[in-house]
């Protein structure tokens, strides 16, 4: 569904495949205390599985890294009996559900994130020229991927990206 509490808002199909995109923050090779998303097993802790929202439970099995040690891929197994909406959906307990995209269907997108324009709450309150108080990092542009249903988005269409906030096309 487009919104689980408002079924009248319709639904869309997402394809599931062997290669998926997840957010980098949804996996930790060395998780901090209290981390509740996808992890590998360690000598003293089992792997932490997660539910892929509206899909299956997955568990990380290994990672690939580039020459700088940055993780470039997470390998995982999925448990076919845990598909959302089936009798076995809750057969493996998880502490989190994460969103994902099929690599095959994901569309590249430019995302613009905006922060405060000024570095102080009241730029006109002092004797400093307001132009000196402009936040040089008030706009961040990054490349990302979005689900295929956004390909027909029109200017000013609004979307909520789960756990991230609201965005305007």
What are these regions (language model features)?
Residues 1-168:
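Polyanion-binding catalytic cores of nucleic-acid enzymes and NTP/SAM-utilizing transferases
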């Amino acid at each position: 569904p487009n919104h689980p509490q408002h079924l009248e808002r319709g639904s869309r199909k997402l394809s599931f495949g062997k290669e998926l995109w997840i957010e980098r923050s949804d996996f930790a090779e060395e998780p901090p205390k209290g981390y509740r998303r996808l992890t590998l097993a360690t000598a003293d802790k089992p792997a932490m599985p997660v539910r892929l929202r509206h899909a299956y439970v997955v568990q990380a099995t290994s990672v690939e890294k580039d020459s700088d040690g940055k993780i470039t891929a997470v390998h995982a197994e999925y448990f076919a009996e845990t598909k959302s909406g089936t009798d076995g959906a809750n057969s493996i307990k998880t502490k989190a559900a994460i969103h994902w995209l099929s690599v095959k269907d994901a569309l590249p997108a430019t995302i613009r994130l905006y922060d405060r324009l000024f570095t102080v709450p009241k730029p006109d309150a002092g004797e400093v020229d307001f132009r000196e108080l402009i936040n040089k990092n008030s706009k961040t542009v990054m490349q990302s991927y979005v689900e295929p249903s956004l390909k027909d988005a029109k200017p000013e269409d609004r979307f909520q990206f789960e756990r991230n906030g609201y965005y305007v096309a």
